[in-house]
UniProtKB/Swiss-Prot annotation:
Biased segments, Polar residues type: 244-255, 796-812
Record-stated family: Belongs to the SIP5 family.
Keyword flag Cytoplasm: yes
Keywords tagged on the record: Cytoplasm
Domain of life according to the entry: Eukaryota
Main location as per UniProt: cytoplasm
Annotated Low complexity bias: 14-33, 200-211, 387-401, 632-651, 689-701, 748-758
Transmembrane is among the record's keywords: no
InterPro entries: Sip5/DA2
Signal peptide (residue range): none
Name this polypeptide is given: Protein sip5
């Protein structure tokens, strides 16, 4: 039965809900709790709610997820709609205020000179304007002429097109108000009575107020004035006492001043109020608009400034102090500065835009009449309640005397009661500074923790060490030092970490235990001690970081220096190789030229020798250019030495002196391009090249047909070469014993070292043919070639001659 009743009971509920939702979505959109959303979105969300109650769990969960996603997506849209609504409300409130409220012909809302955000306190600004301590927001004129008539001034002040001087538009026509009679003055006196809500009304006041209640209310009346003027005036004694004793809100509302409207009087001294205000218009030096002469005056330099420009001037955002100066003239921030010693953000007071003096403030001298809104508790209005200023009365009977027009000679203090500073219209600057300091402290703490964690995590050698992470620096340093001793090449095993570990262990061993005992004994340690320890930790960490950076920079500088040294060594080596190669090319150019100038029939043996000599100039050449001599067998080497011996024996009878004289200058000229260190590598190819060069030089001198045996001692008397031939040396050694000896001779060409030392590899490659008769002749040929081609510069060479070679020479 219960289930059937439930089944019968649910459909009407759901249908009624559905109908109500449909009606609400189509007709009354504002009655829904989701009225701030878009029409389609609100109807869709309202239509989905009955389904959630009817369907099962599965469908509701899916729709719930979709609804949550939808709410996340429309959060920014709701914020934008909220801001749009606030802006529309401000526009409507501005229109209403400009239509119904004014202070002495000025307004309580801005006139749109600046389109930025109005971040000043509007309630404080409104109160100061109603108290006549700050100039109202006058309507600014783009142009002004002193010759304008009254209706032209009225049109300009109301924002209408300026008519011709002799033409008065119908909307600007006015009639002088008639003089008020005695009956007409009584309602004004009754209206200007100060409503006293803290005590009961007297019988006379109640009778007078109840007799003419309609005439006591001015028109138009603001909502605030109507709400505060009707109920307190007609409230009985019992209600007053009850409100004082039971309502806390009532006591707070009674303590605030009440706004009342003065009687409507559009004339001042028989003139329209617009014409009276703007007949002596003055220009604001900041926005360059023309305003009534009743403007704010700066306290320091007595310059005029309109209220709309004044409320735009504010303190700069909180920032670190410049030039090491502390925040001046900020007594309210002394406590904050003491509490935030580590976050030294300051908020300097605004400076005067004219004389750049700090603590910018203004003073205001109101016009000599009162119109519009006033505070009921304003003591300056009490003497005039019985004699209100009429349009026909003189200015002398006004409440405040007009200004004398004389400029103030001295500046006023920022603490003067008549001075309104920029901090007065923005009283939240201290809270903003505190919030900025707190935010900076949080960011600093987060950055410090992040840097500390990054440093400690990077100092571990592996990921396993990160699990042992703790806030104790000494323990972390000890663990990292133990784990990183094997890996000396890692970054954390550098001297920087050792220095940092040493720096962290500067404290005494009992410091940590003392701090731990203090922490257990005092659960809430003093704030100063914790801040001091935190500052010490920060200083210690900064010192550690500075040492680490210094060591890292020194290591980087050392690596750069080593790299530069390696580059310089490589560059010098390349230059040496290039110079050596160039020296070889220049040294053998004349020899190749002399060999190419031979006019003799080509022979196979001669061609082989020539190709071998040409390959010496570039030792890195391809194997097809004559390097196959290195890879020949000892038999082939012996055959080549035999051929060179036969060629040398045919030319033994030639006198070498003319050839030596001819090649002297060429050797001297080629020596000018060589350096003593440019020596080719010792190779046995040098022997064949030298033999071919000596043969080519000997063939050139065969045209003189000199005959006779070669005298080895004759070479020692040459003026250009200071040496003895190898044959003479061998001849001299025959007279001695059969042991081997070293003969120190001086050669005049750097390449002689290679040619002399190249005999040793030949002897090593031909061990079986060292006793053949062809070997001494080849050695003598090489020596002759060396003697003929050596330049002046000499180097000491040692030639080792065995006894077998000397015996073979003796037999020849």
């Amino acid at each position: 039965m219960g289930n059937s009743q439930t089944k019968e009971f649910r459909p009407p509920l759901s249908s009624s809900n559905r109908r109500s939702h449909q009606w609400g979505s189509s007709s009354s959109h504002g009655r829904s709790p989701y009225s701030d959303r878009h029409h389609a979105e609100s109807s869709r969300s309202r239509g989905s709610r009955p389904d959630l109650s009817i369907l099962g769990i599965g469908g509701s969960s899916e729709r719930d997820v979709a609804t949550l996603e939808h709410r996340r997506e429309t959060k920014q849209e709701r914020e934008a709609r909220r801001l749009e609504k606030e802006r529309a409300a401000r526009v409507k409130e501005r229109e209403r205020s400009m239509r119904e409220e004014h202070v002495d012909g000025g307004y309580l809302v801005t006139q749109g000179v600046y389109v930025g955000t109005e971040d000043f306190n509007k309630a404080v600004t409104r109160q100061l304007m109603i108290e006549r301590r700050l100039a109202p927001f006058w309507r600014g004129l783009n142009d002004f002429s002193e010759s304008w008539t009254e209706h032209q001034l009225m049109a300009a002040a109301r924002g209408l097109p300026i008519p011709p001087p002799d033409e008065i538009p119908p909307e600007l026509e006015y009639k002088n108000p008639p003089k008020l009679s005695g009956d007409g003055k009584e309602p004004s006196i009754q209206h200007l009575m100060v409503p006293i809500t803290s005590r009961s009304q007297s019988y006379g006041s109640e009778a007078s107020q109840s007799s003419t209640p309609a005439h006591s209310l001015p028109a138009p009346v603001s909502p605030i004035a109507s709400g505060t003027s009707t109920s307190p005036l007609f409230r009985s004694r019992a209600k007053t006492l009850a409100s004082l004793t039971t309502s806390k809100l009532g006591s707070q509302s009674d303590s605030t001043p009440k706004e009342i409207h003065l009687p409507e009087d559009p004339f001042v001294n028989g003139q329209p109020i617009e014409a009276y205000l703007y007949k002596d218009a003055t220009e604001c030096p900041i926005c360059f608009l023309y305003y009534p002469p009743y403007l704010n005056r700066t306290r320091c330099c007595d310059q005029p400034i309109c209220s709309e420009c004044f409320v735009q001037i504010k303190r700069p955002d909180p920032h670190p102090p410049e030039h090491g100066e502390a925040e001046p003239n900020a007594a309210a921030a002394e406590g904050d500065r003491q509490d935030n010693q580590d976050c030294q953000l300051v908020s300097e007071p605004a400076a005067c835009p004219f004389c750049v003096q700090p603590e910018f403030g203004v003073t205001y001298t109101p016009p000599p009449f009162r119109r519009g809104l006033v505070y009921a508790t304003d003591p300056t209005l009490r003497p005039n309640f019985t004699s209100p200023v009429s349009s026909t009365s003189s200015l002398a009977s006004a409440n405040a005397s007009p200004g004398t027009g004389r400029r103030r000679a001295t500046s006023l203090s920022a603490n003067d009661p008549a001075v309104i500073t920029t901090d007065r219209v923005r009283p939240d600057w201290a809270q903003k500074l505190a919030n900025a300091r707190a935010h900076a402290a949080r960011r600093s703490a987060a950055a410090t923790a992040l840097h500390t964690a990054a440093y400690l995590m990077n100092s571990t050698a592996s990921g396993n060490e990160s699990r042992n992470f703790s806030l104790g620096r000494r323990g972390v340093m000890r663990r990292t030092g133990q784990s990183e001793t094997p890996s000396a090449s890692s970054r954390s095993g550098s001297p920087a970490l050792q220095a940092l570990a040493f720096l962290t262990d500067r404290r005494t061993p009992g410091h940590d235990t003392d701090s731990a005992e203090e922490g257990t004994g005092n659960l809430a340690p003093p704030r100063n001690s914790s801040r001091r320890s935190r500052i010490d930790d920060l200083e210690e960490m900064m010192m550690m970081e500075a040492i680490r950076l210094s060591l890292a920079s020194e290591e980087e500088r050392r690596k750069k220096a080593e790299k530069e040294a390696r580059k310089e060594a490589k560059r010098r080596e390349k230059e040496n190789k290039k110079a050596e190669k160039a020296a070889r090319k220049h040294g053998f150019y004349s020899n190749n030229a002399s060999s190419s100038a031979l006019d003799v029939p080509s022979d196979a043996r001669l061609g082989r020798v020539a190709s071998t000599s040409s390959s010496i100039t570039g030792e890195d050449a391809s194997p097809s250019k004559g390097k196959e001599v290195d890879r020949t067998s000892p038999a082939a080497t012996a055959a080549s030495s035999q051929s060179s011996t036969e060629i040398a024996s045919e030319s033994m009878t030639i006198n070498p002196h003319p050839n030596v004289v001819e090649q002297g200058p060429s050797a001297q000229s080629s020596m000018a391009q060589l350096s003593p260190r440019e020596l080719p590598k010792p190779s046995h190819l040098r022997q064949v090249s030298s033999a071919s060069s000596s043969f080519s030089s000997l063939v050139e001198s065969t045209g003189e047909d000199h005959s006779g045996a070669y005298d080895g001692n004759a070479s020692s008397t040459e003026p250009l070469f200071n040496f003895r031939s190898l044959a003479a040396v061998i001849g001299d050694e025959d007279k001695g014993d059969g042991t081997a000896e070293h003969v120190e001779d001086t050669s005049s060409k750097p390449s002689a070292e290679g040619s002399a030392s190249s005999t040793a590899p030949v002897a090593d490659e031909m061990p079986g043919q060292s006793t053949t008769p062809a070997d001494p002749i080849a050695v003598k040929t090489v020596a002759e070639d060396r003697d003929c081609l050596m330049p002046k510069e000499l180097e000491t060479q040692s030639v080792e001659i065995t006894s077998a070679t000397r015996n073979a020479e003796a037999t020849t």
